[in-house]
C-alpha cells in the first residue's frame, strides 16, 4: 500500500450520486471507492449531495472529500467551488479545470490555441435551423460525423451520423441535452485510446475496441464485450509521446491531479484529442482501475493514491 498513515486523511466524505444524467454510474463508482478507502483503514463515509446540503460536510467535521460525482454540478466546477468555500480538500481538478474539462466546446477552443490536436468541428445552437446547418456542416466536414452535447459526460446522447439526412434529427436530439451542440469530424483508421492520469503514476495507454459503432454509454458501463487492450499495441516510443501530449492536453485546461484524456488515431497514426474527464468513472468497467491493475496496483491502492494527492499543497 501507500505507506501513509490512514489517520492523516482525517474524516473523508465520498461524494457520489448527485442529480446529473450520470447518477447511476456515480452511485456505482462511489460505493466501490468507499469500500476501497475503508479497506485501507481510512475513516470514509458516503455523502450524496442530492439528499443532503453541502453545509453538512463542515458541520459534521469532514476535512477531505473524494469526488465520485460524474457530470453536472459534480464535475463542472460548482461542487469544487463549494468545497473551496468550506475549506475541504478534494480529489481532482479545481473550479477552472473542472469547468473547462466538462465543456467540450471551450476545451476544443483552448486546445486549438495551444497546439493540442483535436478533430475539426462546428457548433450548433439550440433553436438553429437544423436542416440548414446540417447542409453547411456536411459540406465543410464530410461524413461520418459525431454529434455531442457540449457538456455531458459518459457519452450521454452522443450519436454517430453516417448520412446527411440523419444529421438534423441528431442535432435536435443533442440540443435537448445542451444549448450548444458539437458536430465533430469522425477520425477513422487508427482506433480509440485513453490516457489515465493519476499524479506521478506512469499508467499505460489503453486501446478501446467496442463491439458496436463506438465507445458509447452502453459500451462503457453495461456491455461485457468491449475489449480493453493493455498493452495497447503501439510502439513504446509512440506511446511515450502520446502520453506526453495527453498530459499537456490535461494541463493546458487547468486540470490537476487525476483524470483521463481520450483520443483517436487516424490511419497515419496522428492523434486527435476528443475530451478530458476530470472525475473518471471508478466502476468495474472503468478505465483507471484497469490501467492501474495492469501494473500491479489494486483498486484500494489506487483510490488511496488519488486521495493522497489532496495532502499536497
Swiss-Prot record:
Residues recorded as binding ATP, renumbered to this chain, are 138-193
Q: At which positions is Mg(2+) 1 bound? A: 262, 275
Question: How does the cofactor attach, per the note?
Answer: Binds 2 magnesium or manganese ions per subunit.
Query: Any idea of its EC number?
Result: 6.3.2.4
Gene Ontology terms, MF aspect: ATP binding; D-alanine-D-alanine ligase activity; metal ion binding
Could you tell me the gene encoding this protein? ddl
Question: Any idea what this protein is called?
Answer: D-alanine--D-alanine ligase
Q: Which domain of life is it from?
A: Bacteria
Q: What does this protein do?
A: Cell wall formation.
Classification of source organism = Bacteria, Pseudomonadati, Pseudomonadota, Betaproteobacteria, Burkholderiales
Q: What class of enzyme is it?
A: ligase
In which broad location class does this protein mainly occur, judging by the first location in its UniProt entry?
cytoplasm
Cellular component aspect of the GO annotation: cytosol
- Single Gene Ontology BP term? peptidoglycan biosynthetic process
User: Pathway of this protein?
Assistant: Cell wall biogenesis; peptidoglycan biosynthesis
Cofactor(s) needed for function: Mg(2+); Mn(2+)
Regarding protein family, the annotation reads: Belongs to the D-alanine--D-alanine ligase family.
Q: Which organism is it from?
A: Burkholderia ambifaria (strain MC40-6)
**One Pfam family for this entry, by name?**
Dala_Dala_lig_C
What keyword terms does UniProt attach to this protein?
ATP-binding, Cell shape, Cell wall biogenesis/degradation, Cytoplasm, Ligase, Magnesium, Manganese, Metal-binding, Nucleotide-binding, Peptidoglycan synthesis
Q: Where does Mg(2+) 2 bind?
A: 275, 277
**Catalysed reactions listed for this entry:** 2 D-alanine + ATP = D-alanyl-D-alanine + ADP + phosphate + H(+)
Q: Which residues form the ATP-grasp domain?
A: 108-308
